[in-house]
């Protein structure tokens, strides 16, 4: 993710890495390697993926900011000004956030048997986020669809709309969630790390 952000001309001093009290040795070693280049904040406990919405943290954030999980692969065709485009969508549509759609096209590499929960596959679950296009947007297409911690730009002005108040931008903005692909099968150690109350797929 860090390399992808740099390729989009995002300055390293504008990138903040928030760690939720990780114990994985490999990850801790990685933090040591990058701590002089990026802003690194270590929480003293695992507060979950939405900890930044807690008032005493949220109040410190700028009016517009972006949050992402690290396991996304950007679309190679996504424009370098994608942050500004997402920001403008939050203004035009009075939204808390605007983010990237997630690719669920069933390629041979896509793990179609991966379960999102006990009742449905990832594909079955994710279909709900492709049902409601906003007709005035065509290139790229924009869908009314909630976002948790997938890459999104946040507009603090509209936090009262609710945490999931969002749109997802498709076409050249559509990205891949790497754990859904067979060539990115995660290790048992990583599965154990993800197998918490915060995980929404397994």
Sequence positions of predicted segments:
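Acidic ATP/Mg2+-coordinating residue in the GHKL
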Residues: 19-20
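Short, well-formed alpha-helical segments that are part of the catalytic scaffolds
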Residues: 1-8
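Conserved donor-nucleotide/metal-binding helix-loop-beta segment in metal-dependent transferases, i.e.
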Residues: 78-97
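Short beta-strand-to-loop element that shapes/binds the nucleotide-sugar donor at the catalytic cleft/hinge
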Residues: 98-113
């Amino acid at each position: 993710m860090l390399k992808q952000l740099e390729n989009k001309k995002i300055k390293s001093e504008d990138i903040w890495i928030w760690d939720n009290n990780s114990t994985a040795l490999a990850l801790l070693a990685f933090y040591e390697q990058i701590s002089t280049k990026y802003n690194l904040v270590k929480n003293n406990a695992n507060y979950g993926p939405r900890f930044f919405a807690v008032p005493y943290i949220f109040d410190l954030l700028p009016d517009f900011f972006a949050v992402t999980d690290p396991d996304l692969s950007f679309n190679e065709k996504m424009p370098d000004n994608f942050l500004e485009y997402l920001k403008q969508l939050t203004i035009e549509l009075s939204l808390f956030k605007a983010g990237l759609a997630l690719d669920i096209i069933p390629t041979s590499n896509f793990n179609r048997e991966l379960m999102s929960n006990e009742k449905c596959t990832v594909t079955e679950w994710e279909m709900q986020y492709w049902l409601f296009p906003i007709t005035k947007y065509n290139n790229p297409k924009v869908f009314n669809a909630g976002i948790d911690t997938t890459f999104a730009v946040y507009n603090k002005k509209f936090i009262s709309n609710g945490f999931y108040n969002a749109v997802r931008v498709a076409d050249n903005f559509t990205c891949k969630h790497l754990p859904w692909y067979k060539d990115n099968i995660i290790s048992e150690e990583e599965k154990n790390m993800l197998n918490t109350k915060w995980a929404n797929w397994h």
